[in-house]
Every structure is written in C-alpha cells, then in structure tokens.
Amino acid sequence: VYGDITADKIPEIPELLTPDYVDHTFRRKNDENIIGIAYDTVAPVYTDHNKCNIITISGADNMGRTNFIKYFALQMLNSEIDTHIYIADDFRRKLSDIGQENVSYDLDPDEFIQKIIMIEVLLEEKYKRLIHQENPEKEITLIIINSQEVYTAISDSKDALNALKNIMGKYKVLNVYLLFGAVPNAQIAYGSPDIYKMMKETKSILFFDNLDNCKIVDIPLAIKRKNQKKIEPGDAY
C-alpha cells in the first residue's frame, strides 16, 4: 500500500482449502461449487450443477479423498439454500463427524437402500409440482456413498438401482448432488456391477493419485506425459 494505491493481492494456493476460505476469497453462484484450485492458473475450479451433479472419487489411501468429501458437504451446509445430506458410510466411519442437523447417516446397506427408494419418492413428488408450475422448495439434496458394500447392495437390488438411475438422471434438475467415495481404482469392465458402469459413463471422476496409477479410466499417454509431477495429499486430477 502506498498512499491511496493498493497493490493487487498475489493469488496463492492455500495450504488447506476450506469452505471458509472459499467463501471469503471467491464469488460463486448457488448452482456452482468450488471443488479445488488449479495449480496452473491459481483460479478456482467450479462444477456447474446444471451440467454435472455427480462426482466419483477414486485413488490411493491417505491422499485426501475423505477430506474432499467433508469439504464438499460443509460447503453445501454453509450455503444459503437448505441442504439435506444422506450418507452411507463403511465400518471405518470416516464421515461420522460431518454434522447432525439435516444429516442422515447409515452404516447398514439394507437401510440405506430403503433411503434411496424414499429419496426417489420425495423427488418424484417435487418433480410433479415443478411440472404443474408450482414453486418447489429450492432445497439441495446431497447423497454421499462411501461404502463398497452399499455399491454391491444397490447393484443387487433392482428397485434401488432404478431409483438411483432416476435420481442421477430424471431428477437432476431438482438440485440433487451425488458423491461416490470409496470407489476402487480398478478397471470397470463388462462384468462390473452396474453402479460402477454408471459412474464411468458420467465422465466426472476426481482421481487422488498419480496418473500412471489410474486404472478406473483410460488416460491418454499425452496427458500422462504432460502431468508427470508427483502429487501430494490433497491434490487430484
């Protein structure tokens, strides 16, 4: 600062990206979420709900996958729009501390399957109100699945799988987000469970590991060569 002249603040990558940092540093619309900051531009990376409401999270252990899920959930809870979060966790209970208010937390796959079917019914009613030009509530529904057992249970249940397909597709316009965590870094082949095929088809994957180790999708060699720097915990492609 010199007299009335103020120098522009030099953008930087924070050591820890938090919802508070995002809210105080960047502007975002209600239909946008900041999922990180790009190293090359030091600019926020947005997801536009109208274009992409699903994020599949894969990669190595201890590289920040759980922290990202918590960050995303807290960003939603801190928004001005009412948010309801439904969590399916595994035996490690890594997401048990996300919050209590407006948060439903399950460890039992069978119980969560019933939740998925219930959510579809609620969204169907909301969708009908939208079609009849009523003003449905502008609340956000965030579904977080962080359990391979739950993925298997959903794939084995025709009702749950159809419900999830509708939630991911038909009811996308109703402020619905889905985070798929604990997704194995393994090739999704013809015989893989349907839910993994659905994830791959969205082409919206955050990979927390070096690209040379990526198996869940095929990475072109040119992109691998361009991104050879080893990543650190909290980094993702």
Please report, for each region that a protein language model flagged, where it lies by residue:
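Phosphate-binding and hydrolysis-coupling loops of NTP-dependent motor/remodeling domains
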Residues: 1-36, 44, 189-237
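P-loop NTPase catalytic phosphate-binding loop
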Residues: 23-203, 210
